[in-house]
Structure formats: structure tokens, C-alpha cells
A protein has these predicted regions:
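Helix-helix packing/entry segments at the starts of transmembrane helices
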Residues: 43-45, 102-109, 175-198, 230-266
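Juxtamembrane helix-loop-helix junctions in multi-pass membrane proteins
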Residues: 21-52, 171-196, 209, 214-216
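Hydrophobic residues within membrane-embedded alpha-helical segments of Major Facilitator Superfamily
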Residues: 22, 29, 49, 81-82, ...
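Hydrophobic residues within alpha-helical transmembrane segments
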Residues: 14, 18, 44-49, 77, ...
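Membrane-interface interhelical linkers
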Residues: 1-18, 51-78, 91-96, 120-132, ...
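Hydrophobic transmembrane alpha-helices of multi-pass small-molecule transport proteins
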Residues: 54, 117, 126-148, 166, ...
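Hydrophobic/small/kink-forming positions within alpha-helical transmembrane segments
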Residues: 24, 28, 55, 79-84, ...
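Structural signature of hydrophobic alpha-helical transmembrane segments
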Residues: 38-50, 94-110, 155-167, 217-227
Length: 294
């Protein structure tokens, strides 16, 4: 047992970083697969597969299900915000030409925005450092967005969708903390994903052709996003929470945008000029300040 302790410590040190890298690939996978399927159709298939797997896992593990209609309602709202609105807007933004790294950067403001929203909604206290971090994060993102639009990379609509994705994610996190804090992660996530799947099928049926080109590239992106990322990241996150590593994961999530930018550079040749790089650095520092321990 004692011999296993150093290995466990090393594992618990490395795994949060692995989770951050996995999370970063979500934006890359979206851009990789979108040439072969429309955004809502892509997500409809993805959410359906993930929801079915999660429901099966929940039944096999005999996980407790919500006991009231109100509990289901709250789970559905969170699913729509965290998955349908957030990921839906991310996918549509990338489809409108926004760099994957830029969508990751804007989404990366979530801890800062949640900290500010939590003041009025949850009554949580926010320090001066967190306010400074929020201002720096917002300013850094504004620099990147302005520079990218000036260079003709992306469109105002695409950038607006990225902001909508951030709002959906941030409001969803607050809503879940207020109304779904006691949910079972297995059944709760299954219901949230099912709600997002229904929403995406409605969008797909109403505004898209529903055609998917099942190429090798698309299948790889689909399997990666649906199984490796959606399920693997959830399992890894649950393990880290059980091991008491949730705080470390939260403190490292501000690294998602630069990691996504590195992936984007090598896979799609997405580049950052001097102004955009400074903006990303300022934004990352800002989110890091929001996450710092008081």
C-alpha cells in the first residue's frame, strides 16, 4: 500500500493536466468535423449517442433518478444552457469562420463571468483580485476579437455567437449550482444531454438539411467528441473530484485557451499576431486571477 502512494500522488498531479488537454480538443474536434456535417446535425447525433450511453451506464450502476417533475425541469434547463446553447453556439461560430482558438478563448472567460454573476445570484463574495481578473479577461478577449475581425478572420455574427456560448455556459453553471447541486452526476448528466439532443434535432429538422458525409475524418471527430471527450472527460472529472482534486482542475482550466491555440496552429495553421497574442496573454492572466486562492 505504501509503495502505491507515490504513484497515486504522481497520477493525481498529472491527471488534471490531461483533463485540460482533453477539454481543449473539443474546440479542435468541432472544426475538424464541421466540413462534413452542419452544426446542429453534428451535435444532435453526438448528444444522442452520449445520452444513450449515459442512460445505460446509469441503469447498470443503479444510479438514483430524480424524484420530481421539478427536478427534471431544472435538469432540462441546465442541459439546454450548458450543452445546447453553449456547444451549439460554439459549433455555429466555428461554422461562420471564427477560429477554434478564439472560441476557446471567449469560452475561457466562464470562471470570471460566473464569479461576477454569483455576487447577485448566489450572494457569494468576490475579491478585488477577482474583479481585476474579470476586467483583464474581458479586455484581453476584446483585443483578440477586434484584431481577428480587423484581419477578416470570422464575422461579427460568428463572434456574437461565441459570446452567446459564453453566456449559456456561465448562466448554466450558476443555474446548476442553485437548483441542481444535489443531482446524481450519472443520471443528471444523462437527462441534461438528452434535453440538448432534442433541442439540436429540432434545430436540425427546421433549419438544416440533416445530411452527413460519413468520411473517416468525420467519424474520427465524432467518436472523439462523443466517446473520448464527452464520456472520458466526465469519468476523469468524477475521479478527480472523488480524489479531492476538483480545485486543482478549476485552477488549471484557464490554460484551455492557449492549449487550444497550440492545437489550432499545428492542425489548422491558425496564427495569432502580436496584438492577439498579447490579448490572449492578458485574458489568461485575468482568468488566472479569478481562480487564485484568496
Amino acid at each position: 500500500m505504501k509503495a502505491d502512494l507515490p504513484s497515486r500522488r504522481i497520477l493525481n498531479t498529472v491527471l488534471p493536466g490531461i483533463l485540460v488537454v482533453m477539454w481543449s480538443t473539443g474546440f479542435i474536434g468541432a472544426k475538424f468535423g464541421l466540413p462534413y456535417a452542419e452544426p446542429a446535425t453534428f451535435l444532435a447525433y453526438r448528444f444522442t449517442v452520449v445520452a444513450v450511453i449515459l442512460v445505460v451506464v446509469a441503469f447498470l450502476m443503479r444510479a438514483p433518478w430524480p424524484k420530481s417533475a421539478k427536478a427534471y425541469f431544472h435538469l432540462f434547463i441546465v442541459g439546454l444552457l450548458l450543452q445546447a446553447v453553449n456547444l451549439g453556439c460554439v459549433f455555429f461560430a466555428i461554422d461562420f469562420g471564427v477560429d477554434a482558438s478564439v472560441t476557446a478563448l471567449i469560452n475561457g472567460l466562464q470562471p470570471a463571468l460566473v464569479a461576477i454573476i454569483a455576487i447577485s445570484v448566489l450572494g457569494e463574495r468576490t475579491s478585488g483580485w477577482q474583479w481585476l481578473g474579470f476586467v483583464l479577461g474581458l479586455g484581453g478577449v476584446a483585443m483578440v476579437v477586434w484584431r481577428k475581425l480587423e484581419l477578416g478572420v470570422g464575422t461579427p455574427l460568428g463572434m456574437s455567437l461565441s459570446v452567446c456560448a459564453l453566456l449559456g455556459l456561465s448562466i448554466g453553471v450558476i443555474y446548476q449550482k442553485k437548483f441542481c447541486e444535489d443531482m446524481d452526476l450519472r443520471t443528471g448528466t444523462a437527462m441534461q444531454t438528452a434535453a440538448a439532443a432534442v433541442a439540436m434535432w429540432i434545430v436540425s429538422a427546421g433549419w438544416e438539411t440533416g445530411v452527413v458525409d460519413w468520411t473517416g475524418e468525420f467519424i474520427f471527430a465524432f467518436v472523439w467528441l462523443s466517446v473520448v471527450l464527452s464520456l472520458g472527460a466526465i469519468i476523469l472529472l468524477l475521479y478527480l473530484i472523488r480524489c479531492g482534486q476538483a480545485a486543482r482542475v478549476s485552477s488549471l482550466f484557464f490554460l484551455v485557451p492557449p492549449v487550444a491555440a497550440i492545437f489550432s496552429y499545428f492542425m489548422f495553421n491558425e496564427t495569432f499576431g502580436a496584438v492577439a497574442m498579447i490579448g490572449m496573454l492578458v485574458a489568461v492572466i485575468g482568468v488566472g486571477l479569478v481562480n487564485r486562492n484568496p
